[in-house]
From Swiss-Prot:
Higher taxonomy: Eukaryota, Fungi, Dikarya, Ascomycota, Saccharomycotina
Any one GO cellular component localisation term in the record: nucleus
Function: Involved in mRNA splicing. Helps to stabilize the U1 snRNP-5' splice site interaction.
InterPro entries attached to this UniProt entry: SWT21/TCAB1_mRNA_Telomere, WD40/YVTN_repeat-like_dom_sf, WD40_repeat_dom_sf
Main localization (coarse): nucleus
GO BP field: mRNA processing; RNA splicing
Protein name: Protein SWT21
Organism whose genome encodes this protein: Zygosaccharomyces rouxii (strain ATCC 2623 / CBS 732 / NBRC 1130 / NCYC 568 / NRRL Y-229)
Cell compartment(s), UniProt: Nucleus
Subunit structure: Associates with snRNPs.
Length: 414
């Protein structure tokens, strides 16, 4: 079934094209027009010389504030941007509220789940970033011109090199987990530079060099379980880590794909939806049965090396973008029961359960690589669209950007 799309607000043509410096120029012009020459300026990068800027600017991640009033985006131009959802209703263009740059490529980052520009305290308005050849760092989203608030020791004592975290997840207000090479997971306090503990899976030589690629995520960016964590690796393995014993337990190895990139929990916590690279299938695992695979969801395309990120909400269920500019969905009722019908049946040909709903977004020349749904306006989502960064420069116009809109879903009409 296909659904209509309501009008939204987006970055228009700011991120279009294949020249990073021109993107910054267009963004500056949009900022000046919005602020009417107030004298305020967006932060500019201090490292433009000697870089290869003939490429598109692609969003790597999107985070909503807890009150739905703003979003934070991480882009591959080393930039971190904040956008405030307009309350005036007289503009359809997203212009950054703030923009800051790192000196190195951002491998991964994570905004504090309690972040909001309307917080009474700045303690939660922070972002963790992991970059190449740098320690893990915490930055303020309130004072984007300020220095690093804290840095965390991720150095390998054997080699003397920084180990790059590939996954970050907040456990509670003051603690977070990082995952890196050799199946290594560490728990940090925000206020200590060294880890509280470090755990490492030892499943023999075949997995000794696995990279922890993702942690399980609760809906709406809630804090993860304080007692245990599920993490995935680029070796297609899932592990359960008990925080009390710090001993990981092997759960499952998938035969399809080339590494887990996202693990989404259902609201009731009974099912885990596991996304992987280089496959068109999403694994469905039953958490009550030692994470036994019980079903699969079939995507209308095969995910490549460019990550696609989905989200789960109580209104729209599981939503994910496609490589031809659409959004596909499985209803919340289906997601809460593993997309298994009332008779306990699943798709019997091994192809996976097809989407129940498709949203036409009018972005046929671009792929929608991120869909993040608002934690307060349950039908509203922020999405990122871009060309495939793994291909050579196309002849057609490359369309990239951020778009915020409402997905109108009438599941009862299906």
């Amino acid at each position: 079934m296909y659904a209509e799309l309501k009008d939204g607000m987006g970055t228009r043509d700011v991120f279009d094209g294949w020249n990073v410096q021109k993107v910054w120029q267009k963004e500056d012009e949009a900022w000046i027009n919005r602020t009417q020459n107030s004298g305020m300026k967006l932060q500019n990068p201090a490292f433009a010389q000697g870089k290869n800027w003939e490429r598109p600017v692609i969003c790597q991640d999107i985070f909503w504030s807890r009150d739905g009033s703003s979003i934070v985006t991480i882009h591959d131009d080393y930039g971190i941007r904040q956008y405030v959802m307009s309350l005036e209703g007289n503009t359809d263009q997203l212009v950054p509220y703030s923009r800051m740059f790192k000196s190195q490529s951002i491998v991964t980052g994570r905004v504090h789940p309690l972040y909001s520009l309307y917080n009474d305290t700045e303690d939660f308005n922070v972002l963790l970033t992991a970059c190449k050849d740098l320690p893990l760092q915490m930055y303020s989203l309130q004072d984007t011109e300020g220095p690093c608030l804290n840095h965390y020791n991720v150095i390998n004592n054997e080699t003397g090199n920084w180990e790059i975290p590939h996954a970050i997840n907040w456990s509670n207000e003051d603690h977070f987990l990082i995952g890196s090479v050799k199946n290594r997971v560490s728990l940090f306090s925000c206020y200590r530079s060294s880890p509280i503990w470090t755990s490492q899976s030892k499943r023999g030589n075949s997995t000794s060099k696995s990279i922890v690629s993702c942690f399980s995520e609760r809906p709406y960016g809630e804090f993860s379980n304080a007692k245990h964590t599920i993490f995935g690796t680029y070796k297609n393995e899932l592990h359960l880590l008990d925080h009390r014993t710090q001993h990981p337990q092997f759960l499952h190895r998938s035969a399809q794909g080339r590494g887990y990139i996202q693990l989404l929990e259902s609201f009731n916590g009974h099912y885990l939806y596991a996304l992987k690279r280089n496959t068109n299938l999403i694994d469905v695992l039953d958490t009550r049965e030692s994470h036994r695979p019980v079903n699969q969801l079939q995507l209308p395309f095969t995910m490549g090396n460019q990550k696609h990120k989905a989200s789960i909400t109580s209104t729209n269920g599981l939503t994910i973008g496609t490589d031809d500019g659409k959004i596909v969905c499985w209803s919340s009722n289906a997601i809460e029961f593993g997309v298994i019908d009332r008779n306990g049946l699943t798709c019997d040909n091994g192809a996976g359960e097809k989407p129940e709903l498709t949203h036409e977004m009018g972005l046929n020349s671009s792929r929608i690589n991120i869909v993040q749904q608002s934690p307060t306006d349950f039908g509203v989502c922020a999405l990122s669209y871009s060309p495939d960064k793994m291909t050579y420069r196309p002849d057609v116009h490359a369309s990239s950007g951020i778009y915020v809109t409402e997905l109108t879903t009438d599941w009862f009409g299906l």
